[in-house]
Amino acid sequence: MGKVYVFDHPLIQHKLTYIRDKNTGTKEFRELVEEVATLMAFEITRDLPLEEVEIETPVSKAKSKVIAGKKLGVIPILRAGIGMVDGILKLIPAAKVGHIGLYRDPETLKPVEYYVKLPTDVEERDFIVVDPMLATGGSAVEAINALKKRGAKSIKFMCLIAAPEGVEAVKKAHPDVDIYIAALDEKLNDHGYIVPGLGDAGDRLFGTK
């Protein structure tokens, strides 16, 4: 059964304050999102398995630990998820990066995939799906669906800010997926924005509307 983790680390909360602030410019916003993604990746990878190897220091031979051959994949949901990728790759530079693009069907209002590019060895990888916002949960649910349809067995979802409605939607559709959140906000408003949230993450990351 998947769990929900909300990070209360002081550095994450400090940086989130400036991410939320409407007066934060594009450059600083982009840097802060990347930094928080790095801090969250540190926590998410805490359970990676280790194995012992023998090395030689300048002083003597020694036994030490390395990550036990895990294959990791980072999957940003386009377009805002791209802003979190480099922060994760700073800690896990060998991870493969895929992409999932979704658009909202004008009639059903449900997300539909228009672009999926994944590593070839999907079944062998542990995936982290990233998107700054988890609002209604529709995009996250569909992105995880896209991975599972292609054989993914191990999936985590990571976002900066979530609404309770989005968390419940992902838990209901994918009860096996762990959800990692920097902040759990109050609710969604009538327009589907998280309150208090941070506005449109994609617009603020790329300086476009």
Swiss-Prot record:
Pfam families (UniProt xref): UPRTase
SUPFAM superfamilies recorded: PRTase-like
Alphabetic keyword roster: Allosteric enzyme, Glycosyltransferase, GTP-binding, Magnesium, Nucleotide-binding, Transferase
Cofactor dependency: Mg(2+)
Sample GO molecular function, one term: magnesium ion binding
Cofactor annotation comment: Binds 1 Mg(2+) ion per subunit. The magnesium is bound as Mg-PRPP.
Binding-site list for uracil: 194, 199-201
Binding-site residues, 5-phospho-alpha-D-ribose 1-diphosphate: 79, 104, 131-139, 200
InterPro entries: PRibTrfase_dom (IPR000836), PRTase-like (IPR029057), Upp_B (IPR034332), UPRTase/APRTase (IPR050054), Ura_phspho_trans (IPR005765)
Involved pathway(s): Pyrimidine metabolism; UMP biosynthesis via salvage pathway; UMP from uracil: step 1/1
Its job: Catalyzes the conversion of uracil and 5-phospho-alpha-D-ribose 1-diphosphate (PRPP) to UMP and diphosphate.
Cited PANTHER family: ADENINE PHOSPHORIBOSYLTRANSFERASE, URACIL PHOSPHORIBOSYLTRANSFERASE, CHLOROPLASTIC
Sequence similarity: Belongs to the UPRTase family.
Protein name (database record): Uracil phosphoribosyltransferase
Originating organism: Geobacillus sp. (strain WCH70)
